[in-house]
Amino acid sequence: MPMSRRLRWYLDARGVDYEVLPHLRTQTSLQTAREAHIAPERLAKSVLLEDEQGYLMAILPASRRIELGRLERELGRNLELATEPELVERFRDCEVGAVPALGEAFGIRTLIDDTLLVAEDIYFEAGDHEDLVHVNGDSFRELMADAMHGSFSLPQA
């Protein structure tokens, strides 16, 4: 599956300079960082969460894991991971596990971990398990201008 059409449209409509980088097929974000020869701190991964208020996309570095309890306390919400059928339905032009870390491109409220806001370059899934999108840090911060942000992750064990 090539780059998500919706993602491409979103980036193009905003005039963002980006490049699509192919890599060998991977199943985890840490594998992707290794295959693409990039620091896991610069690979943004998405985690789709939900509760009675709706969906929320949490974006954090591949080198970190979400601290769900902390996030729930900060937001005053009772969040859980979205199910695979929900991912398939919500991201029709993406493979499961390769959802781009740009929730707003898909009409989903987004929360970004503060650790990503200082990076010079950011990479994220293009919608498949074989391509990454690369943008510079300033462009990424502009894309995230309307996103909430906070500290809700811990280093991978």
Predicted regions and their residues:
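Extended, low-hydrophobicity, polar/charged segments
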Residues: 1-157
